[in-house]
Amino acid sequence: MKKIDLNADIAEGFPFDESLLQLLSSANIACGLHAGGAKEMQSAVKFAKENKVRIGAHPSFPDRENFGRTAMALSSQELIAHLRYQLGALKAICDGEGAVISYVKPHGALYNQAAKDEKIARVIAQTVYQFDPNLKLMGLAGSLMLRIAEEEKLQTISEVFADRHYMPDGSLVPRSQPNAMVESDKEAIQQVLQMVTKGQVNAIDGSLVPVKAESICLHGDNQHSLQFAKRIVEELEKNHIKITA
């Protein structure tokens, strides 16, 4: 039986976390610098533990104004400090709840920059390894960040997206472009099944791009995306694909 991990961003201030956590196998918990805060983090950790969902840290640039989606030119030392701050905060909450962090997935602009910027990718990988060498790093399948992470002796998790279109080089179509998002639920479900069962995805130019799908990112920031997440789970189970971290 094929297996796949389902992850989503949690503790970002949206009202669907508890419902979403019943569908997921992994939760990317925001660490306060792009959204959420101590209260949201603690609730998310509790819910994740209750639902036996793997916990991941979801650090970002210090950018609450733009939800962490704006690229920032930080020095290496500044980025290290912000990463340590966020990982440390989540670890303290996990320690208090008897839970553990299993992986790290950068958020938003930090995720996108690390996918193609060697300096940023290496700072992230080295900081995570120094914090806890047993943590895994989750990132875009086939990205530079995952290659750098492996060089830095970190285990990795290759992530694919249900609701994003892909460029021919395997990167995501930027959100600034009109065709960035997969708008149809039917198309998104077909894309997920194609990536999980065949290891490939259709790029926007029609070419087939090979992808290593170990985890699927879902979104749960509105009622429709929550219903869509339920449909994805149903389709995976219907196709005998086990959801597990």
UniProtKB/Swiss-Prot annotation:
One GO MF term: ATP binding
Gene coding for it: pxpA
NCBIfam families: PRK05406.1-3, PRK05406.1-4, PRK05406.1-5
Name of protein: 5-oxoprolinase subunit A
Pfam families: LamB_YcsF
InterPro entries for the chain: Glyco_hydro/deAcase_b/a-brl, LamB/YcsF/PxpA-like
Physiological role: Catalyzes the cleavage of 5-oxoproline to form L-glutamate coupled to the hydrolysis of ATP to ADP and inorganic phosphate.
Annotated EC: 3.5.2.9
